[in-house]
Structures are given as C-alpha cells and as structure tokens.
Design a protein with these regions (language model features):
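Extracellular attachment/recognition segments
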Residues: 1-73
Length: 73
C-alpha cells in the first residue's frame, strides 16, 4: 500500500519476484528488511519499469521480507 501519497510504497514478499509500486519512475530507492528480526536484507534489485522492481535473493529468505520503495526527485 501507499505510505506517503505518491512518493512511497511498501509490500511484503517471501521469495524472489516483482513488486509493482506504480510510482511512475525508475528513480527509486529500495530497502529490504526481515519482518521477524528487523535486520536489513540484501538482494539484487532490477528496475524493470517505471512502475515495478524485481527483487532477486541469492537464496530464499527464511522469513517474510518487507520491501520499501521511495521515489527520489
């Protein structure tokens, strides 16, 4: 869902996949964290379109991962 009007988006995922943010730009910062431990999680991020990113993990995460996307500029 939207966090702050049309500038931020958050979603929860459990594996590698696409996240549609509908922010209309590839100028976004993506941050990931484990919803159980609250530790920052690292993954490859591909800005596949102006409205989506793909998150690719090296291995499937143990817990759900919160994806925070923020529009820049």
């Amino acid at each position: 869902g939207l966090l702050n009007g049309s500038t931020s988006f958050a979603a929860t995922i459990t594996a590698t996949g696409a996240v549609t943010h509908n922010l209309g730009t590839k100028d976004v910062i993506v941050q990931l964290y484990d919803v159980t431990t609250f530790d920052t999680v690292y993954a490859d991020i591909d800005r596949t379109s102006v409205n989506a990113v793909t998150v690719t993990f090296g291995s499937t995460p143990t817990n759900s991962i919160r994806v925070l996307v923020q529009k820049i500029g």
